[in-house]
Amino acid sequence: MKHSKLFIFAIMTTLAVSGCKHQAATYPTDTLTTKNGSQLTITFFKHASLAIETEGRHIYIDPISQYADYASLPKADLILITHSHYDHLDSAAVAALSTAATTVVCDRTSSETLGGKCLTMKPGDTLAPRDYLSIEACLLYTSDAANDRISVDL
């Protein structure tokens, strides 16, 4: 009888644990209709980390590994890093989102951290890294012209 109870307990525990699945994280999103009628979806992860998806294109801004499991998300066409603070630049998140075709746009300091394989901008610069996107680097309160920190205005 003692072995029967132990056996039943083991089966019940196995069934209970096997029924637990890891639920995928959900994040707030907002979908907008652009002037040309296409849908643009913005997903907010946390702090300054967000994603923009439109017409199958994926743009990530300030991805930080603590805020999302970027390896499970669609790969990036473009990654924008606004400046080199720890809560805006995470090389592991950039690597998780990148492919050989991914373009990373950032300031000079962030580019050095990422190994220099980026398009760099400083306040006042404009750049069109893709035919569907134009970026203007603006000097904001977290910016310091001497350090070439930027904020990206889409």
What do the PLM-derived regions correspond to, one by one?
Residues T41-F44, H58-D62, S134-L140:
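Active-site-proximal beta-strand elements of phosphoester/diester hydrolases
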Residues F9-A16:
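Bacterial N-terminal signal peptides
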Residues Y141-A146:
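Conserved small/polar residues in nucleotide/adenosyl-binding loops
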Residues K2-K5, V17-E55:
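Zn-dependent metallo-beta-lactamase
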